[in-house]
Amino acid sequence: MLSRLLSGYASVEGRYDELLSAPGIPRPHWDAFLRSLAARQGLEVSETLALMESEMRENGITYNVYADPKGADRPWEVDPLPLLLSATEWDEIAAGIAQRADLLNRVLGDIYGPQELLRSGAIPPSIIFGHSGYLHQVQGIRPPGGVHLFNYAADLARSPDGHWWVVNDRTQAPSGSGYALENRLVVSRVFPQMFRDLHVQHLASFFDALRESLLRWAPKDVVDRASERANPLVVLLTPGPYNETYFEHALLARYLGFPLVEGSDLTVRDGCVWMKTVEGLKRVNAILRRQDDDYCD
């Protein structure tokens, strides 16, 4: 059955083949998935794909496309054939991305701090000071824990010899985590047995770490008088419903348990940010922004 499934598949010369290690031979981490897929009847596969599309529509998953003549809200689509990576390969990717994020955070800390990289000539000052993204207003600001780059993502591509390349850094308000979460939820409902058998690494630990980091870096002197325990208020700042990833903003706010706010929902008084509510102003202790930094004000 597996040979029939792969009968029409052909590798492209000069490209890395994610699926096969040799003609007709799946890579080890693909084998179980392909055998499970091959065991399904054609009608069953069609019904499964239809169920997946139905789940997406019912959940209202959209991606807003600016200036799209078909309308702003475009339904989100999930490729039924996933990209499978072995645990070993993913660990290598994760370590490399973490190292790159740490480097970029240190560079930001120096540029907005002592500027030793500029003084030494390692980075020409004209590149920094002439860049539209450099914000003179925040020069000298020291964020909690020295974390200038709180959230980071990278666009990856596979090289012809199988190595991974970073083709773009996402350092402003990287999107994708919410869509990845929704994809996982839909796929786990549509392919429950296959999802369990493949031992897919869960995403919950990432979102738990994100939530805990925001709460940890929030001021410690905020106390909820009712419970007499630290209870910082964290909000997720969105540009609004016309942003291309607004669905993700709403999803993340709900999943993390943070209020979703726009700029008009906030005000600044006595050097502090406050959220407007029907019960009055509530002090905000941390903001997870989903818009570019120069648009925050």
Per-segment meaning from a language model:
Residues 1-297:
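Preference for protein termini
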